């Protein structure tokens, strides 16, 4: 019942936003918001078209570029996501979210070094981006920067102690530092928060503690 109601509400919002775009065809924000609502409704191609229109009207709209990049990433169009996020960074070097997105793209492409560069820039501009600290932990572990991994994991947990993946990554970082008791504590916390901790990791941890 509530799902149908939500869909009806979304359809109503879309209709209102479409009307606003007809009435104000030159409004960047109208097209931008329409794109976001289309995305929420799962109408991805229309979301792309609306955000592209917003960027056509204002090529310097960093927010529209970032949202278009996130949309492309979700659609698996990684190279397009890369291009628009690079465009956003060129316009605004201080955009933490654009740097974070580029880090995720390069991590997805398997380039841990490049990912780390962008993640480092992201938290320099906004130290409270918890997902970036979480991703940085994973990248540092891939590169076997164990001290840095522990530092990044600690920052994530400090920001959001009840973020399940932050607790999991802290457990893994502690494991690689040889602090198995602390690793067990944080793995248990991740499990309690509903995170599907890798069974192989739990087995390895149990073996070290036995």
Predicted regions and their residues:
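N-terminal coiled-coil initiation/transition segments in long coiled-coil scaffolds
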Residues: 2, 16-23, 29-33, 37
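TPR/TPR-like alpha-solenoid helical repeat scaffolds
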Residues: 2-5, 172-176, 196-210
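Structural signature of tandem alpha-helical TPR/SEL1-like repeats
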Residues: 5-19, 41-53, 75-87, 108-121, ...
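Structural marker of alpha-solenoid helical repeat scaffolds
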Residues: 23, 57, 91, 125, ...
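Conserved alpha-helical positions within TPR/SEL1-like repeat arrays
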Residues: 29-40, 62-74, 97-108, 131-141, ...
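Boundary/linker segments of alpha-helical solenoid repeat arrays
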Residues: 62-63, 96-97, 130-131, 164-165, ...
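Ankyrin-repeat and related helical/solenoid repeat scaffolds used for protein-protein interactions
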Residues: 131-192, 196
């Amino acid at each position: 019942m509530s799902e149908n109601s939500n869909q009806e509400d979304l359809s109503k919002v879309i209709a209102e936003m479409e009307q606003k775009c007809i009435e104000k065809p030159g409004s960047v924000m109208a097209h931008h918001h329409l794109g976001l609502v289309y995305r929420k409704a799962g109408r991805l191609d229309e979301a792309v078209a609306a955000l592209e229109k917003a960027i056509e009207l204002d090529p310097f709209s960093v927010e529209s570029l970032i949202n278009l990049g996130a949309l492309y990433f979700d659609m698996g169009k990684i190279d397009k996501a890369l291009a628009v996020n690079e465009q956003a960074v060129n316009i605004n070097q201080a955009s933490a979210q654009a740097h974070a997105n580029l880090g995720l793209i390069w991590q997805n492409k398997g380039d841990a070094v490049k990912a780390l560069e962008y993640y480092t820039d992201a938290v320099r501009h906004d130290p409270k981006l918890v997902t970036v600290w979480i991703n940085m932990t994973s990248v540092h572990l891939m590169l076997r920067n164990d001290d840095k991994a522990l530092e990044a994991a600690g920052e994530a947990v400090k920001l959001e102690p009840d973020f399940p993946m932050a607790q999991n990554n802290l457990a893994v970082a502690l494991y690689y530092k040889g602090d198995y008791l602390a690793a067990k504590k944080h793995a248990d916390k991740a499990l309690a928060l509903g995170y599907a901790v890798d069974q192989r990791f739990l087995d390895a941890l149990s073996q070290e503690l036995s």
